A protein has these predicted regions:
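PIN-domain endoribonuclease scaffold, especially VapC-family toxins
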Residues: 1-86, 93-98
Length: 102
């Protein structure tokens, strides 16, 4: 999946926002800035997936497998857009087959 050049990859604007918040609070633990992440994504051909109203609304219908609001947004976006969500978070696969643990 990752090496297939036909696949299109997206990064949620919520992920950029999360990096910005966490880097500001703990730069020792999160050494990457939001600007660096955006630059990396653009240079790598990764598309931005903006948070839309319907994504925000979809969070309310998710089962409570995970309490992190950023991760819940990623799940809602992937589900609403019909995308696969690649994650290393063990709490996300219960949301469905579209969540791929990496």
């Amino acid at each position: 999946m990752l090496q297939d050049t036909e696949n299109v990859f997206y990064v949620s604007s919520a992920s950029i926002w999360e990096v910005a918040i966490k880097h500001s609070a703990r730069p020792d633990e999160i050494p990457v800035t939001a600007e660096q992440m955006i630059r990396f994504c653009r240079n790598s051909g990764i598309w931005e997936l903006p948070v839309q109203f319907r994504h925000s609304q979809a969070v309310s219908s998710l089962p409570p497998h995970h309490n992190d609001p950023f991760d819940r947004m990623l799940v809602a976006q992937a589900r609403e857009e019909g995308l696969s969500l690649l994650s290393h978070d063990r709490q996300l696969p219960p949301y469905g087959e579209f969540v791929i643990f990496v």
